[in-house]
């Protein structure tokens, strides 16, 4: 346990005392800490293990160049690129087992950019004054743990010592984990998307895949989830996909918070990864709102509240045609090994018959548009069932298993 190394990222010109304390705490636990300096203007307040000149050189510049015109917008990309290169080289030699960064607004931004470029599974912690708010820009789709600093990270005192010590212990503790992101068998790892309104179906699918000997990674399809799944495809960690929840596309088209960006639904086709698709959750979008307040522009829409602050309007026939158009466009690069299963009795529990968002006209418009627009490389099957029905899920699982066989 004493051979684990934590790289500590900090601006040592302003956070030298705190960085030295963190290094001391990790050493006291039996670990090894390396201080990586991303500070530019002043002299380091403690001796770095990886000095700023080395980081800058690895980022494609020189200390002299940056000091001649010390601008944050010029220095940050260089430090970020240099730190990424250094840490990735260390990872290749099994010389780093966790990364801990800390800072205020700029330090947090730089640490986050570095960690977002590091592989899934490597422990990553940011102790930040920015962690009590919207952290999505810092975490993005990576397994980054953010910890609120409470006070400014400026000097040691009873509070900061305690919190810095906790962060150091957390990083050291994570470094001890024996698990690595790797396949446990020769069989494909299956990626699957899910939403709360089709979870019963997702659980049944997962059970069936496991019984067939496959491991499944399930992603909550609310934006970051779909993007994370596709990044793991690119990195080779996922070899087959049951894309059960395509609601992220609806939010992309109509301005909901679940949008996963323009690349969503293009990756599996380009990589040739076997995929079975279901438009789960496409019939609605998710919008944040004041508690139980219907947004003015959706007064005429059939709707429900998923919870007090998440408003869920039912997309009408024209809205659904637009969603079908985008889904079809994004599957144009698919070269085969892809099937779209259409659940004719409802794309989620919200829109089955007698449910609050049931709209047979909108569903028909959607399904007809998909059948008209989907490329010939995507097989289309109409299933007389709802997306959560066991018969639908079993057909989907069987289809993907047949592709893998």
What are these regions (language model features)?
Residues 1-43, 98, 107-117, 121-126:
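N-terminal phosphate-binding or glycine-rich loops at protein starts, especially the Walker A/P-loop
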Residues 11-17, 97-111, 191-202, 222-224, ...:
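Gly/Ser/Thr-rich loops at beta-strand to alpha-helix junctions
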Residues 15-27, 34, 40-51, 185-235:
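Glycine-rich phosphate/diphosphate-binding loop of Rossmann-like nucleotide-binding domains
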Residues 47-95:
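Phosphate/nucleotide-donor binding subsite
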Residues 67-68, 134-197, 322, 382:
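Cap/lid and interdomain-hinge subdomains that line or gate substrate/regulatory clefts
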């Amino acid at each position: 346990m004493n051979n684990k190394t934590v790289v500590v990222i900090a601006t040592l010109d302003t956070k030298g005392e705190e960085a030295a304390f963190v290094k001391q705490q990790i050493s006291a636990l039996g670990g090894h800490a390396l201080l990586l300096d991303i500070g530019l203007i002043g002299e380091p307040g403690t001796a770095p293990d990886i000095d700023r000149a080395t980081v800058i050189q690895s980022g494609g510049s020189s200390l002299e160049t940056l000091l001649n015109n010390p601008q944050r917008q010029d220095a940050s990309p260089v430090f970020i690129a240099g730190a990424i290169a250094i840490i990735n080289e260390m990872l290749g030699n099994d010389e780093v087992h966790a990364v801990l960064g800390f800072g205020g607004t700029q330090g947090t931004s730089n640490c986050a950019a570095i960690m977002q470029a590091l592989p899934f599974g490597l422990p990553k912690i940011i102790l930040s004054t920015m962690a009590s708010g919207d952290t999505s820009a810092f975490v993005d789709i990576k397994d980054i743990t953010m910890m609120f600093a409470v006070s400014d990270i400026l000097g040691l005192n009873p509070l900061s010592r305690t919190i810095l010590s906790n962060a150091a212990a957390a990083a050291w503790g994570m470094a001890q984990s024996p698990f690595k992101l790797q396949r446990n068998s020769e069989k494909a790892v299956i990626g699957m998307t899910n939403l709360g309104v089709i979870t019963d179906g997702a659980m049944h699918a997962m059970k069936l895949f496991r019984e067939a000997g496959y491991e499944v990674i399930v992603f909550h399809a609310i934006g970051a989830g779909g993007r994370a799944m596709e990044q793991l495809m690119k990195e080779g960690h996922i070899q087959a996909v049951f894309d059960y929840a395509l609601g992220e596309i609806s939010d992309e088209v109509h301005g909901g918070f679940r949008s996963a960006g323009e690349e969503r639904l293009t990756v599996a086709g380009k990589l040739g990864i076997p995929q079975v698709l279901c438009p789960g959750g496409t019939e609605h979008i998710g919008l944040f709102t004041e508690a139980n307040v219907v947004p003015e522009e959706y007064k005429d829409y059939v709707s429900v509240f998923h919870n007090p602050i998440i408003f869920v309007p039912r997309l009408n026939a024209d809205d659904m045609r637009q969603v079908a158009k985008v889904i079809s466009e994004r599957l144009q690069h698919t070269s085969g090994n892809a099937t779209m299963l259409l659940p004719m009795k409802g794309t989620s529990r919200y829109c089955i018959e007698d449910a609050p968002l049931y709209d047979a006209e909108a569903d028909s418009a959607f399904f007809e548009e998909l059948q008209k627009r989907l490329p010939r490389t995507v097989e289309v099957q109409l299933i007389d069932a709802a997306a959560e029905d066991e018969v639908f899920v079993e057909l989907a699982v069987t289809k993907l298993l047949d592709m893998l066989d």
